[in-house]
């Protein structure tokens, strides 16, 4: 999550998924909202990967990953480290709905109705599987809301890295707003039921053909520039920062790594969400809904497909103050938030196969 810094964009018509193109047969494209923190052009992406000394040497094929979505300058090589194991052509993206409160959205997953999303190497097609899933869900469990997708940065951060290694990717963007655990269970069950039917009908393999990418930034920590809120329960000196980091690693180790289970997913929720109000933070991970919803979907999908259990591997953890920011200014990019002991963000990367 970033400090409030958004660019004005044209209002977009909120269309149904059953209307893929406008009357003039022009494709409906979702444009990039954050061209400061993320790459918009191919030359920017090529330059970033060169500066990161990227080599595509990951022999693993991940079925699911949990990845950050903050400025490239801060997250750095954590992006390719986690995303280069995503080999599937069709990728279901579970993102954060940072502005859900502004649109009074909760307890429904949020789809878009765009034909494609703008990306550095050309528009990325939205998979036809999206509409198939949407049509299978009761109206009460989803909404199609292009406006919130158009101002949300959590998914567009990932697409350039995914597209860099596979120009043919197709995506299914999903935002997860405030949501109770019971509602997560209900919706994920129905999504998995339909997804299983689609995979069987088309001979699609999980990992090879379809993958799930879940995004969250980890703790948003500090006592400055958080909209007047204090997110530093351990303090902001060196000891407080160390304790906050240790708390982060405890969450990752006990909830996100090893064999995935409903108990671990519930435990993650208990770490991050207030027990008496699921809308409120306990520990400030912006993906306090996208992570459990995405992992529940993965857990249930494994139960009806692979049936061998899903296991999470810790890839890395870093923060926006661990290392000097990657220099991106010569690429006409920058940062959208400060990074110091009074304002920093954590980044967790976990992969599942």
Residues of each region from the PLM?
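Active-site histidine-anchored catalytic micro-motif
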Residues: 20-292, 296, 300, 317-325
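Long, Lys/Arg- and hydrophobic-enriched amphipathic alpha-helices
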Residues: 300-353
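Exposed boundary/loop context
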Residues: 8-9, 88, 280, 339
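Bacterial Sec-dependent signal peptides at the C-terminal "C-region" and cleavage site
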Residues: 8, 12-24
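Positively charged n-region of N-terminal signal peptides that target proteins for export
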Residues: 1-4
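Amphipathic, positively biased hydrophobic alpha-helical segments used for protein targeting
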Residues: 10-11, 106, 298, 305
């Amino acid at each position: 999550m970033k400090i409030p810094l958004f660019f004005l964009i044209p209002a977009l018509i909120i269309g149904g998924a059953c209307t893929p193109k406008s009357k003039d047969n022009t494709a409906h494209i979702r444009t990039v909202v954050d061209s400061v923190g993320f790459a918009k052009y191919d030359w920017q992406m090529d330059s970033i990967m060169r500066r990161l000394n990227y080599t595509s040497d990951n022999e693993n094929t991940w079925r699911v990953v949990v990845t950050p979505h903050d400025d490239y300058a801060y997250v750095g090589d954590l992006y390719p480290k986690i995303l280069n194991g995503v080999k599937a052509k069709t990728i279901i993206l579970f993102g954060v709905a940072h502005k859900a409160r502004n649109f009074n959205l909760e307890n429904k997953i949020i789809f878009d109705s765009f034909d494609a999303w703008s990306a550095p190497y050309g528009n990325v097609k939205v998979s036809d599987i999206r509409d198939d899933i949407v049509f299978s869900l009761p109206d009460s469990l989803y909404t199609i809301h292009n406006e919130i997708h158009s101002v949300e940065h959590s998914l567009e951060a990932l697409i350039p890295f995914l597209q860099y290694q596979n120009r043919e990717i197709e995506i299914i963007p999903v935002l997860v707003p405030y949501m109770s655990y019971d509602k997560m269970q209900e919706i994920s069950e129905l999504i998995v039921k339909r997804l299983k039917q689609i995979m069987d009908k088309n001979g699609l393999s999980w990992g090879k053909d379809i993958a799930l990418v879940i995004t969250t930034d980890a703790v948003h920590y500090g006592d400055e520039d958080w909209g007047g809120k204090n997110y530093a329960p351990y303090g902001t000196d060196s000891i407080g920062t160390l304790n906050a980091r240790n708390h982060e690693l405890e969450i990752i180790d006990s909830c996100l790594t090893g064999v995935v289970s409903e108990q671990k997913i519930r435990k993650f929720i208990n770490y991050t969400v207030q027990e008496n109000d699921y809308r409120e933070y306990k520990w400030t991970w912006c993906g306090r809904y996208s992570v459990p919803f995405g992992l529940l979907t993965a857990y249930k999908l494994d139960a009806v497909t692979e049936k061998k259990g899903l296991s999470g591997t810790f890839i890395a953890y870093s923060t926006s103050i661990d290392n000097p920011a990657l220099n991106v200014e010569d690429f006409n990019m920058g940062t959208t938030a400060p990074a110091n002991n009074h304002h920093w963000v954590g980044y967790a990367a976990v992969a599942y196969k």
